[in-house]
Amino acid sequence: EFRRVLFRSQVMAQKLLIRDLTLRDGQQSSFATRMTQQQIDRVLPFYKDANFYAMEVWGGAVPDSVMRYLNENPWDRLEKIKAVVGNVSKLTALSRGRNLFGYAPYTDEIIEGFCRNSIESGLGIMRIFDALNDVNNVKSTIKYVKKYGGIADCAVCYTIDPKYPKLGLLDKLKGKKNPEPVFTNAYFLDKAKQMAALGADMVTIKDMSGLIQPSRIAELIPLFKQNLSIPVDFHTHCTPGYGLGAVLMAIIKGVDIVDTNIWNFAGGTGAPAIELVYIFCKKLGVELDVNMEAVAKINKELYGIRKELEAVDASKQFPNPFNPLTDQLPAEIDKEFDKAIEAAKANNEEALLNACHAIEAYFNFPKPNELVKKAEVPGGMYSNMVAQLKQLNSMDILEKAMELIPTVRLAAGLPPLVTPTSQIVGAQAVNCALDIKAGKPMYSNVSNQFVNLVKGEYGKTPVPVDPEFRLKIAGTREEIPYDTSKYQMQPNPELLEAGGVKLAANEKEVLLLELFPQVAKNFLTKQKVAAYEAQHKADAPQAEKVVAEEKKNEPITGKTVKAPMPGSILRFTVKPGDTVTKGQTVVILEAMKMENSIATDYAGTVKRLLVKEGTTVAADAPMIEIEA
C-alpha cells in the first residue's frame, strides 16, 4: 500500500509524464500491427535511455497479430522488451475488462492466471477498459492486477451521442422528441469515480477515435482533477484533426500524463508526436523528463522500419524530418505554436485548431479525415464498413449504412463506439442497409455478436434495450447476462503429427488458446510440428500423400453450402456423416471480426467438409458438401 501511495504522490508531483504508444497503439493505428520482434529489438537500447514514464507495448491487437501474421509468441514479445528496458519505463498493456485480449467474457480463474503471468513476464501497468463503460466488467481485472503488484489504470471510454435527424414542425406537433444526451461530463466523472472506488491507481480519459474536441477536454480535465485523488492520463488520436489541440489543452488544464507517438509513427490515425508536445512544454515552462536525444535515435531507426512496413502503411505519407534539439523552427511556424498556446488559454477552439493544423501541415502530417469528422465515428469503424461493402460489391449503399448507425446504435442500447462494439454496430448497419436494398425487413441478417450485445451478454448498455426489440433479435424479453459458470475451456488435444505432445504445454500457452482459440491453435500447432520435424526429419510415406491428394481433388457431386461473404472458417458445427435439416447452422464464418452463423439451404447428410477450420475463403467458395 505504501508503494502505491508513493506512486500516486510521485506522479502527482510531476509536471507532465509521457506514455509512449509507438510499439503498440502507434504501430497498430498506422501499420496494421506488423512490427516484428527483430524490428522492435533495433529500437530497444535507445528506449532504455529515453526515460519515458511508461511504454505501451502489449495488448490490443499485438498478441493476435504476432501469432497470426508473424509466427511469434506474444509472451516472448513482452519478456524480451522487459529484458532490455528493465525498470526504466513501466511496460503497459491494453486489456478489455472481462474479455482481456479476446472477445468473450472470461472466468475469474482465467483473469487471475492471465494477470499473474502478465506481471511475472514484465508488465507494470494494465490499462483496463470496457466497451460499454460497464464498471462491473473491470472489477476482476483491477483486483488481480493489484494482487500481483501491478498498477491498475482504468480507462473511461470517451464517446459522443449520435447525431439524430432534425425534427420537422409536424414531428414536434406530434410530440416527437429526440433522446436526451447520455454522454455528459457527469456521466464520465461518475464512471471514473466508480473505478477509483474499486481501487484504480490512475484513470485515463481514453478517446480511441479522436473525436474529443479541445473545448470538451478543457471541461473534463479540471472536473476529474477536482474530484479524484489519483493521476489522470489523456489518450487521443489525430484522425479527425482534434488530437494535437486537445493534448495541448489537456496539458494547460493540468493533466498528469499524456499519450504520444514518436515522430515517424505519429499523426494521422495515430496519436500526436512527442516532439510537438516537447516544443509546447518548453514554451509553457512545463517540465518534461524525457531524454529527447534518445528519442531522436529511436526516430531515426523508425524511419527505416516504416520503409520496411510500406505494404501495410495506412497513409504512406512521411512527416518531414525534424529534430527539436537541433533543427531551428522557421519564425512563422514558431509563431503558430505561440498562437496555439494563446488560443488554448483563451478557450478559443477555432484559433487553436487552425494553428495546430498549420503546424501539422508544415511538417507534412496527414490532413484531418473529413469523412470521420463529419460522420463522428471512429476511423477503424468507418474503414471496416468500407472494406465490408467492397467485398460485397455494394459500395453504393455506404451512405445509407452510415445514416443507419444512430438507429442501430440506439436500438442496441447506445453502446460507446469503441472496439468491439463499434465493429458490431458498424457491421449491423451494413447488414440493415443490405436488407433494405434486397427489399427485406431490417435485421433480417444479424451477427452472433449483435444478438449477444442486445441480449445483455456484453454487460449493461448505457441505456436499456427495448424488451420487444430484444425479443425480435435475441428471442427473449429479459436481459440475460453472460454466465461464466457455463464457460467451457478450449480443447487441448495431443498432436499426433508432433509426436503426441500437448497442443498447449504450459499455462501461458493454455491462456493463448483461451484468448485466441483459432489463431493460437494454428500458431501452436505450427510451432510443435516444426519442432518435431526438426528433430525427426522423416518424410510422411508417399502413398499416404497420394491418397490425400486424390481425396482432395475428388469432384463435388452433392449440394454445397457456400460462403455468403469472404471470411475465415472459425468452426464447423457438423461432421461428415451427420444428418442436417434445412436452415440448420453448419459453419461459423468470421468476417470483419464478426461471427456469422451460416445455415444450409438443403436437408441431407454431410458428405465432407471441403475446407479446414482456420482457412480463409472467398465469397461463394464451397465449404460443405451435402448429399440430399
Task: Describe the role of every protein-language-model region.
Residues E1-L6:
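Short, small-residue-biased leader/transition segments that mark boundaries at the very start
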Residues I18-L23, Y53-V57, S89-R96, M126-R127, ...:
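Hydrophobic faces of well-ordered beta-strands that scaffold small-molecule active sites
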Residues G26, I128, V203, G254, ...:
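Conserved, mostly hydrophobic/aromatic
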Residues Q39-A61, R116-I125, L198-G199:
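Catalytic domains of carbohydrate-active enzymes, especially glycoside hydrolases
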Residues K48-V66, E342, A346-P555:
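Terminal or standalone catalytic/regulatory effector modules within metabolic enzymes
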Residues G59-D190, G210:
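Active-site beta->alpha loop and helix N-cap motifs at the rims of alpha/beta catalytic domains
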Residues P240-K253:
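Catalytic cores of alpha/beta
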Residues E554-A628:
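Structured functional modules or segments
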